[in-house]
């Protein structure tokens, strides 16, 4: 440890999954931490206890398969990095097939006990009502989707009010290689060339009148989820669920997000589509496409069945399904640098769901990275981001720059929260067995295994730098 090492404490605001993991990583590096948690001084409508890292929804950390599932790869990388959250999850696992599910009370009690027992961690039970004072120095804000209103207002004032969202408007995202391009075609409406575009920036899925009418009927009849009481999010016209638009009248969608104007079917130029579903590139790699204007409150089972009615999407594989719910998060690609610092105030770092990741594991992983980056800086070391080929790096890349921001949908935010998935990883060459050509499911599994093996190898190399 060098003589100029700054051992003043790092402050972490928020004792959820991300904040707990960040505090642990910092303390394990030998740097003192003050962890601020407002519960039980101030509760939320979702939390039921005062435990740290309380799981407010499911008790599942999803698949633990580190060979063919991206979240399983993230589990494995977190274990390699000494994650507190994963250690406590493993210790309190309950049977759930191939998934990692936990005893929620035992899990959060274990996290709380480990943090309380750490000699370098001080836990302060208090509400932080504004941005931290400058004398605090380095601070991580990990306040999650239910950030207290006063702190959310302070963050909005610092970052620009338009840079902080208070709900998700999530449209489904599809893996490009599952789209049938014998039916669909590339074209921008009226062949318009936008910033960085070519005039062929959208994938178009055509419908005739009969297909359109059946699709609208299915949207109206599909099973919907209701808002939880604590979400309290009203609909507004700039972001109506697709099924609500369908209920407003049979022609609403084909004069809205499914309008066919300015498009010519490259496979059948003489036949004008009655309606068109457009897909827009969602990441810089071009491996993911989102369904334009298709934010929805349909239940997941209904979404997959109904959206596969769309011509060209019969075999679609979804990286993420749609939703609309309460969530406080930053427009991170604009506001944060590649090590999660606020560009306008670099003593502030953000972590967890407030950065625009989705899910327990993803939030914890971003907390882990924020903690490691912060500890490195406090110890006068370089904060080195993980390679984009790792699950850590793929997720970080989505948050801090991999997402394409577009201006063609006025009133709608381009950046939306995301779970980790293989579509965020750079492509990999799949090794072919000698004398054999891989096809279909066999090829898909081989590709996932290659991505997973590369990710874990590169993660080990990255961790060796710390």
UniProtKB/Swiss-Prot annotation:
Keywords: Cytoplasm, FAD, Flavoprotein, Methyltransferase, NAD, NADP, Transferase, tRNA processing. InterPro entries: FAD/NAD-bd_sf (IPR036188), MnmG-rel (IPR002218), MnmG-rel_CS (IPR020595), MnmG_N (IPR040131), TrmFO (IPR004417). The keyword Ion transport does not apply. The keyword Chloroplast does not apply. Its cofactor is FAD. FAD binds at residues 14-19. SUPFAM superfamilies: FAD/NAD(P)-binding domain. One of its GO terms (cellular component) is cytosol. GO terms for biological process: tRNA methylation; tRNA wobble uridine modification. It catalyses: uridine(54) in tRNA + (6R)-5,10-methylene-5,6,7,8-tetrahydrofolate + NADH + H(+) = 5-methyluridine(54) in tRNA + (6S)-5,6,7,8-tetrahydrofolate + NAD(+); uridine(54) in tRNA + (6R)-5,10-methylene-5,6,7,8-tetrahydrofolate + NADPH + H(+) = 5-methyluridine(54) in tRNA + (6S)-5,6,7,8-tetrahydrofolate + NADP(+). Its EC number is 2.1.1.74. Its main location: cytoplasm. It is found in: Cytoplasm. GO terms for molecular function: flavin adenine dinucleotide binding; tRNA (uracil(54)-C5)-methyltransferase activity, 5,10-methylenetetrahydrofolate-dependent. Belongs to the MnmG family. TrmFO subfamily. PANTHER family: GLUCOSE INHIBITED DIVISION PROTEIN A (PTHR11806), METHYLENETETRAHYDROFOLATE--TRNA-(URACIL-5-)-METHYLTRANSFERASE TRMFO (PTHR11806:SF2). Catalyzes the folate-dependent formation of 5-methyl-uridine at position 54 (M-5-U54) in all tRNAs. This is Methylenetetrahydrofolate--tRNA-(uracil-5-)-methyltransferase TrmFO. It comes from Brucella canis (strain ATCC 23365 / NCTC 10854 / RM-666).
